[in-house]
Amino acid sequence: MVMSSYMVNSKYVDPKFPPCEEYLQGGYLGEQGADYYGGGAQGADFQPPGLYPRPDFGEQPFGGSGPGPGSALPARGHGQEPGGPGGHYAAPGEPCPAPPAPPPAPLPGARACSQSDPKQPPPGTALKQPAVVYPWMKKVHVNSVNPNYTGGEPKRSRTAYTRQQVLELEKEFHFNRYLTRRRRIEIAHTLCLSERQIKIWFQNRRMKWKKDHKLPNTKGRSSSSSSSSSCSSSVAPSQHLQPMAKDHHTDLTTL
C-alpha cells in the first residue's frame, strides 16, 4: 500500500520546478540558455567559454585592419564587457589603440608677444588690488594746512628733575633769584641740564615764591603805577589854575 502510493505520487511533478519545455515555450530562456539546458546541440568535447578569454596574439599579426574571414570572435562571458567603464580591454582581433596626440606647439610669434607684454601677470599669481584708504585713516599733518610751515621742534615732554638737581637749584635760588647768562651756563654744565631747562625752572620758582609771599605780580604793579602817574599829572594843572584865578580877582577889587 505504501509502495503504490509512492509510485502514484512520483508521477506528479512538483509545480515549483516546471520542466525545461515550459521555459522554452514561455520564452524565459534565450538561445544560450536553450543550448545550455538542451544538451544536444554541442558535442561531448564542448567547453563553455571563460569569463575573460585569453587572447592569442600569435594568430593575428599586430596592426591588422580587422579580423580575417576565418577567425571567430571570442564568446562573451557573464563578466564585464571589454571597453566598459571598468577599463578598456582590446580584443584579439582589434588593433591596439593609438597613443594620444601631443598638444600643438605654440607659435613663435605668440610666444614673443606674451613675453613682451609686461602688464600681463603670470598665470599662477593672483591680482593684488590696492588697499582702500578711508578718510579717517589719513593723518592730518600741519603741512597740509599751512604750506609755508617748515616744521619745528616737536612738543617737549615734561622734564623730571632728580632730587640732587632740585636741591642744587633751590640753593642757587636762595642766594640769587635771577641768574646771569654766565651763571646759568655753569649750573647747566654742573647739573647736566640745558640752559632752557634752568631758565624755565627759575621762572616757575619765582612765580611760586611770589604766590607764597602774596606779592603782586610785576606786570600788574607796573601798569598800576603808570595809571596813577597819569592821573596825578591830569589833576595838577587844575590845582595850579585855582590860585591864579583868586589872585586875578583880588587885583580887580583893589583897582
Swiss-Prot record:
Record's compositionally biased regions (Pro residues): 94-107
Ranges annotated as biased composition (Basic and acidic residues): 245-255
Subcellular location as annotated: Nucleus
Keyword Transcription regulation (UniProt): yes
Lineage top rank: taxon: Eukaryota
InterPro entries membership: Antp_homeobox_Deformed_sf, HD, HD_metazoa, Homeobox_antennapedia, Homeobox_Antennapedia_CS, Homeobox_CS, Homeodomain-like_sf
A UniProt-annotated Pfam family: Homeodomain
GO MF term set: DNA-binding transcription activator activity, RNA polymerase II-specific; DNA-binding transcription factor activity, RNA polymerase II-specific; RNA polymerase II cis-regulatory region sequence-specific DNA binding
GO CC annotation: cell junction; nucleoplasm
Main location: nucleus
Residue ranges of the region described as Disordered: 31-128, 212-255
DNA-binding region boundaries: 154-213
GO biological process, one term: positive regulation of transcription by RNA polymerase II
Protein keywords: Developmental protein, DNA-binding, Homeobox, Nucleus, Transcription, Transcription regulation
Location of the motif Antp-type hexapeptide: 133-138
Low complexity: compositionally biased ranges: 222-234
Subunit organization: Forms a DNA-binding heterodimer with transcription factor PBX1.
Family under the similarity heading: Belongs to the Antp homeobox family. Deformed subfamily.
Function: Sequence-specific transcription factor which is part of a developmental regulatory system that provides cells with specific positional identities on the anterior-posterior axis.
Protein's name according to its UniProt entry: Homeobox protein Hox-D4
